[in-house]
Amino acid sequence: MARIAGVDIPRDKRVVISLTYVFGIGRTTAEKIITEAGISSETRVRDLSEDELGRIRDIIDRIKVEGDLRREVSLNIKRLMEIGSYRGLRHRRGLPVRGQNSKNNARTRKGPRRTVANKKK
């Protein structure tokens, strides 16, 4: 397994697919990286030379990925919560942030149902 940005990427897959195992790199970014590095999209990771891996690492070093990206996202959410914006309040309450209906659905964000017992009559 080759290590890129602190992540072991699978050897048997194509380079484009393997790069998506790094947090912050999707298909489009992966394709841009290998084009800039001058590597064929059909190349498998096991066929890469150390020179090609080095070029990929140099390009990825210029992109914010893994820990830095996760830290930035969490700081952005924390900032929204501190300034008291509507989005920050939704994050704090564990509700959907982007305007989705939460009366019936939103179970992923709200968690399992907490049933309330009926009063005795």
From Swiss-Prot:
Keyword hit for Nucleotide-binding: no
Coiled coil (residue ranges): none
Pfam families from the UniProt entry: Ribosomal_S13
Keywords, sorted A to Z: Ribonucleoprotein, Ribosomal protein, RNA-binding, rRNA-binding, tRNA-binding
Domain of life of the source: Bacteria
Gene Ontology cellular component list: cytosol; small ribosomal subunit
Entry keyword annotation includes Ribosomal protein: yes
Region Disordered, annotated ranges: 91-121
Family matches, as Gene3D superfamilies: 1.10.8.50, 30s ribosomal protein s13, domain 2
GO-annotated biological processes: translation
Bias (Basic residues) ranges: 106-121
GO MF terms, alphabetically ordered: rRNA binding; structural constituent of ribosome; tRNA binding
Subunit structure: Part of the 30S ribosomal subunit. Forms a loose heterodimer with protein S19. Forms two bridges to the 50S subunit in the 70S ribosome.
Entries under PANTHER family matching the protein: 30S RIBOSOMAL PROTEIN S13/40S RIBOSOMAL PROTEIN S18 (PTHR10871), SMALL RIBOSOMAL SUBUNIT PROTEIN US13M (PTHR10871:SF1)
The protein's role, per its UniProt record: Located at the top of the head of the 30S subunit, it contacts several helices of the 16S rRNA. In the 70S ribosome it contacts the 23S rRNA (bridge B1a) and protein L5 of the 50S subunit (bridge B1b), connecting the 2 subunits; these bridges are implicated in subunit movement. Contacts the tRNAs in the A and P-sites.
UniProt similarity note: Belongs to the universal ribosomal protein uS13 family.
Name assigned to this protein: Small ribosomal subunit protein uS13
Species this chain originates from: Bacillus mycoides (strain KBAB4)
